[in-house]
Amino acid sequence: MSVFRSVLGACVLLGSCASSLALAGGAEGLQRVKVDLVAPPLVHPHEQVVSGPPKVVQFRMSIEEKKMVIDDQGTTLQAMTFNGSMPGPTLVVHEGDYIELTLVNPATNSMPHNVDFHAATGALGGAGLTQVVPGQEVVLRFKADRSGTFVYHCAPQGMVPWHVVSGMNGALMVLPRDGLRDPQGKLLHYDRVYTIGESDLYIPKDKDGHYKDYPDLASSYQDTRAVMRTLTPSHVVFNGRVGALTGANALTSKVGESVLFIHSQANRDSRPHLIGGHGDWVWTTGKFANPPQRNMETWFIPGGSAVAALYTFKQPGTYVYLSHNLIEAMELGALAQIKVEGQWDDDLMTQVKAPGPIVEPKQ
């Protein structure tokens, strides 16, 4: 930990020098575009294929520390979030664009924060140039020089794991300028895109085995850290709470639509699986320069990664998207539903005989 603090401290000092140079580089003279972020599972409107020169794409994110209810039993988490959601918003740009982020830490917060973009080069992914205390904001610009889906997360000195598992993570998608392609170079199109942010949570219990509730972040730290060190999460959830993407909040689609799922896990490995469907095309490392894998039943997310999977729905019904660590999915909460409308195709599946009395075969 002391090594990380020393490196981050040096980067902060270097950051003061770098910022004085304005980090102009190749961004001077490019068109500047402001984008309003939206809360997951939705993703802000964007083009899949672009022409013309790169742009400077401007985003603004505000850090919010708040208490969140994470299950139907009323269990609470003293959360730290980007823009108030867990995960934070998904940012989308194209390869060659410049991302210009204004990161705001309101005076109502109690902690220092920053952001490490796994897509960025230098200064600990930007963490060394973005540390802000309550009442400050900072502007970071970096070039999106490689395509793919990437994690971003908070990484303050000495507190990285706590901030990450308390909600401060999200995804950035850098699309190829000519769009997503299959291994033969054919354009792949999506009709909808959803972000699924998987979080492992570590809620302390009291001596009677009940989850504890804390009045503020500071009072939760030591107990939470003790649970974190067991490496045993109390909850594993999609988008901030058990059931966040089920029932009335289920994702939606229609037969014939292609849906891109961006699934991020900033801390632990995961194994996504779509019950009743597949991954038609899966970028298992989340990097679009690598050819996607075809017809996947279950794919893998290394901790600290975001993965993209594309599927065209062929049958109506309610699908379940989950981590195929079934204990974590069914017992701890890591599952979502997708409700799909359309006409049933008997050629793909049919019930030949309805349930009824057992008929013994004739001899």
UniProtKB/Swiss-Prot annotation:
Its main location: periplasm. Residues 25-193, 194-363 form the Plastocyanin-like domain. InterPro entries: Cu-oxidase-like_N, Cu-oxidase_2nd, Cu-oxidase_fam, Cupredoxin, NO2-reductase_Cu. Cu cation 1 binds at residues 113, 154, 163, 168. Residues 1-24 form the signal peptide. Keywords: Copper, FAD, Flavoprotein, Metal-binding, Nitrate assimilation, Oxidoreductase, Periplasm, Repeat, Signal. One of its GO terms (molecular function) is nitrite reductase (NO-forming) activity. Pathway: Nitrogen metabolism; nitrate reduction (denitrification); dinitrogen from nitrate: step 2/4. GO terms for cellular component: periplasmic space. Gene3D superfamilies: Cupredoxins - blue copper proteins. Cu cation 2 binds at residues 118, 153, 324. Belongs to the multicopper oxidase family. This is Copper-containing nitrite reductase. It comes from Pseudomonas chlororaphis. The gene is nirK.
